């Protein structure tokens, strides 16, 4: 290898190094420019993103502020509305409490007045009892003195009879006994008259005062009993549609309702007859709906009967609730309320039993207030006293027995149970409220126009009254007058003395009370008439 070759090689290597250096420098410069451009672009993009983020953040903040203001306004409005409602509720409660306080104050004032009046009555009664006790003491002393006189007179008379008439002791005894019996009969009759007069004056006045105060605050109704209901038809052609082909419609109607459908020659009228007023009312509503609807066939009849039966159950419950509210009998068992509602469709001697129960409850409340008893308990007992009549056609036993069992079943107060059991005298009354309920029941039933009897029962009662009067000795004739409110008895004057007619009136009264059931009172009048006649010639 010569020097030239070495030089060429070195020069080539040097040139290659220089070219490589320049290439690397260019690449590094290009990479730097690219990096700077990328960095610039990144910074610009970051600036743009930051700007957009700031704008979005500002929008979000504005939206949040607007939502916050809206929510704040809504919350303020809701708070104001709730505050207004709360103020109204508080005002209503205050108003209700003020009314209750006024009512309580009024009742307390009435109670205080009643207590003052009762205190005065008790004071007067104490004075009357003291006077009566003194009078009885004087009478007892007088009787003892008279008895001693009678004994002395009997001894003297016995001696005189034996001495003067030469009678035996037995004959003398018979004369003395007869004479003494006549005197004692006269004495007893006189004392009975005096006692009757005193008791009648006091009892009549007290009873009239109590009953007058009770009756003037209670308004009664005149109600008539019905066993048929008439339904008006738009035209007589509807009668054929009611009967249906081969009588299918009318048979379906009668079998589902238990009510007889009477279709006769009376124009534009169909009569529903049945003794169960609830079934009769369901039948009436069904018939009227069928006539209005026009679709009369067995399936439609069955559908409407079931529909109106449900409606009737609701009506019965509403009647019971309204009656309980009217008399002020709270917390009654729901089943008991429904049973009481059935009484709206029950009558007794033509009197609606539910209205009668309401009337008895009000009368019992008035009488209880006058006598210082529990008014609410008396009203409750009076309201429930005839509850047994609602189901006495479905359950065996008298309405008193059924009502007593119902009251026990629904855990009524023992005083209420006894009032129900004793209001017809079947059981002894163990409380004043029971006696009050019996009196209110009799008062409601006996007021004019409240009840009516069937002609057969009315005639039977008059006949029984005359038979009782004629069962005594010495009766010439008796007449039941004033619709059975009075019995006049005419006696034989040679068999009954003036003193004996008072005792006879008492005996007749006791027998009537023990053997007859009757509304109100019956006056017994005994008449003894002696006539003397002669003929002037």
UniProtKB/Swiss-Prot annotation:
Entry annotated with the keyword Cell membrane: yes
Q: Which gene encodes it?
A: rny
Q: Which organism is this entry from?
A: Streptococcus suis (strain 05ZYH33)
Q: What is this protein called?
A: Ribonuclease Y
Keyword Transmembrane (UniProt) = yes
User: EC?
Assistant: 3.1.-.-
Q: Where is this region: Disordered?
A: 112-136
Q: Where is the KH domain?
A: 227-287
Annotated PANTHER family: RIBONUCLEASE Y
């Amino acid at each position: 290898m010569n020097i030239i070759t070495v030089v060429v090689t070195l020069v080539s290597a040097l040139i290659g190094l220089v070219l490589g250096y320049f290439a690397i420098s260019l690449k590094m410069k290009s990479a730097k420019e690219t990096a700077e451009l990328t960095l610039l672009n990144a910074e610009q993009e970051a600036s743009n993103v930051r700007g957009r983020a700031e704008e979005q953040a500002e929008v979000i903040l504005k939206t949040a502020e607007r939502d916050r203001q809206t929510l704040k306004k809504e919350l303020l409005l809701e708070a104001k509305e709730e505050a207004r409602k709360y103020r109204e509720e508080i005002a209503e409660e205050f108003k209700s409490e003020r009314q209750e306080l006024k009512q309580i104050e009024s009742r307390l004032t009435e109670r205080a007045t009643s207590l003052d009046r009762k205190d005065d009555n008790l004071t007067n009664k104490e004075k009357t009892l003291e006077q009566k006790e003194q009078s009885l003491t004087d009478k007892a002393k007088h009787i003892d003195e008279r008895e001693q006189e009678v004994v002395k007179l009997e001894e003297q008379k016995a001696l005189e009879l034996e001495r003067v008439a030469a009678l035996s002791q037995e004959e003398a005894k018979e004369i003395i006994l007869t004479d003494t019996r006549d005197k004692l009969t006269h004495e007893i009759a006189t004392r009975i008259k005096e006692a009757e007069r005193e008791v009648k004056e006091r009892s009549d006045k007290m009873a009239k005062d109590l009953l007058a105060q009770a009756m003037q605050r209670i308004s009664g109704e005149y109600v008539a009993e019905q066993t048929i209901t008439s339904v008006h038809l738009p035209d007589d052609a509807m009668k054929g549609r009611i009967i249906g082909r081969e009588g299918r419609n009318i048979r379906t109607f009668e079998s589902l309702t238990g009510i007889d459908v009477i279709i006769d020659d009376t124009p534009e009228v169909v009569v529903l007859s049945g003794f169960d007023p609830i079934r009769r009312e369901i039948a009436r509503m069904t018939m009227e709906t069928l006539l209005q609807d026009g679709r009369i066939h067995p399936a439609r009849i069955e559908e409407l009967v079931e529909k109106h039966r449900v409606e009737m159950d609701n009506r019965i419950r509403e009647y019971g609730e309204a009656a309980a509210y009217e008399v002020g009998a709270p917390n009654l068992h729901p089943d008991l309320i429904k049973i009481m509602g059935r009484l709206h469709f029950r009558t007794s001697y033509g009197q609606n039993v539910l209205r009668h129960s309401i009337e008895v409850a009000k009368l019992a409340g008035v009488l209880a207030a006058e006598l210082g008893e529990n008014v609410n308990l008396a009203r409750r007992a009076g309201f429930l006293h005839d509850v047994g009549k609602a189901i006495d056609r479905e359950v065996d036993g008298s309405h008193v027995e059924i009502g007593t069992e119902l009251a026990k079943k629904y855990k009524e107060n023992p005083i209420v149970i006894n009032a129900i059991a004793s209001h017809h005298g079947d059981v002894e009354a163990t409380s004043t409220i029971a006696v009050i309920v019996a009196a209110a029941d009799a008062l409601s039933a006996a007021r004019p126009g409240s009840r009516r009897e069937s002609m057969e029962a009315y005639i039977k009662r008059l006949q029984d009254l005359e038979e009782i009067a004629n069962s005594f000795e010495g009766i010439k004739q008796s007449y039941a007058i004033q619709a059975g409110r009075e019995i006049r008895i005419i006696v034989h004057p040679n068999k009954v003395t003036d003193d004996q007619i008072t005792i006879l009136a008492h005996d007749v009264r006791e027998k009537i009370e023990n053997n007859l059931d009757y509304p109100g009172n019956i006056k017994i009048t005994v008449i003894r008439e002696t006539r003397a006649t002669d003929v002037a010639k």
